[in-house]
Amino acid sequence: MSVEQAPVQRADFDQVMVPNYSPAAFIPVRGEGSRVWDQSGRELIDFAGGIAVNALGHCHPALVKALTEQANTLWHVSNVFTNEPALRLAHKLVDATFADRAFFCNSGAESNEAAFKLARRVAHDRFGPQKHEIIATVNSFHGRTLFTVSVGGQPKYSDGFGPKITGISHVPYNDLEALKAQISDKTCAVVIEPIQGESGVVPADKAYLEGARKLCDEHNALLIFDEVQTGVGRTGSLYAYQHYGVIPDILTSAKSLGGGFPIGAMLTTTELAKHLAVGTHGTTYGGNPLGCAVACAVLDVVNTPETLAGIKAKHERFKTRLEQIGQQYNLFSQVRGVGLLLGCVLTEAWKGKAKDVLNAAEKEGVMVLQAGPDVVRFAPSLVVEDADIDEGLDRFERAVATLTKG
């Protein structure tokens, strides 16, 4: 029996939702590939990807098939039992990475929460309670739980909620000397995003990551890579650590892993995983059959030589055109990033106006993101068609031309 749904509009958000978001004026109602349609039937090209989540675009046939088949089979059993999709997904991830063990949850924040708890637990078990300090970077972003905002180096997200988690310090990103000065035998973990996504799409220097690995080894600290945004093909490698050739002790993954379905994962070694014994950590929904079935399908499509090579080629297509647009209209001083995570840094004349660029782009029918007030971010589908790239950037250029005319 179908139930007729009451019509809703954007204005309803302001009446019934907690106001912690400020969504766009239009409501997307349908998506296919890299295209989205709103309530009025207007079509937009999606270069935002649900903030680097929709790895295969909208309603990819392989994901629809995986979700539909699993939805007709088994939804949820809790972690009192395991399930087949979770075990298949764990095998796929450990076979493709440095890791031996996987922990599944529902989001990037939960993945990082698990990683930070594991790091402290390992240090506690091996060295005692005095070894509990975590070093993160300024302007990092690791999630919105109290622990993850405390580790994240952005006061705008962590201030105003009472005492933060203690034992956490922050050093400038890509500054190995600052890390060297801060790390000590009390450090249990160093947490790094291989590319700082929310803070401007800033890639790490290879020497910085190599140096961090060496310092962690010298001080018996664990190296955690937060790959929530960079993982699952986003950089043209399955995970960014493979792009850099630096192996962490713990890796976190989410966003693209589910291709739009909520799932997170923490990956680590057998030796470290044993410290999370029965009862030390958990999540009711983590590793549910639906999410794991979809994630298996995502990996089957993304983790192929053809798809990963295509991401690198599409990077060049985006970057070349964005640099041309930036130069022609004096809008971007730099286009940076790896794979299909690109950040366009606004010139001095346009500093602080990333949201204006987003709004102008939306009016021309293209969805993009910002990464702070000074950077326009692109995180499209990893399998976006070249024709969609070209048409989307044509629309984006029209938006820029209109905006810069004033």
Curated annotation (Swiss-Prot):
Binds 1 pyridoxal phosphate per subunit. The gene is argD. The modification N6-(pyridoxal phosphate)lysine is found at K255. The keyword 4Fe-4S does not apply. Pathway: Amino-acid biosynthesis; L-arginine biosynthesis; N(2)-acetyl-L-ornithine from L-glutamate: step 4/4. This is Acetylornithine aminotransferase. It comes from the Bacteria. It holds the Pfam family Aminotran_3. GO terms for biological process: L-arginine biosynthetic process. May also have succinyldiaminopimelate aminotransferase activity, thus carrying out the corresponding step in lysine biosynthesis. It comes from Pseudomonas putida (strain ATCC 47054 / DSM 6125 / CFBP 8728 / NCIMB 11950 / KT2440). It catalyses: N(2)-acetyl-L-ornithine + 2-oxoglutarate = N-acetyl-L-glutamate 5-semialdehyde + L-glutamate. GO terms for molecular function: identical protein binding; N2-acetyl-L-ornithine:2-oxoglutarate 5-aminotransferase activity; pyridoxal phosphate binding.
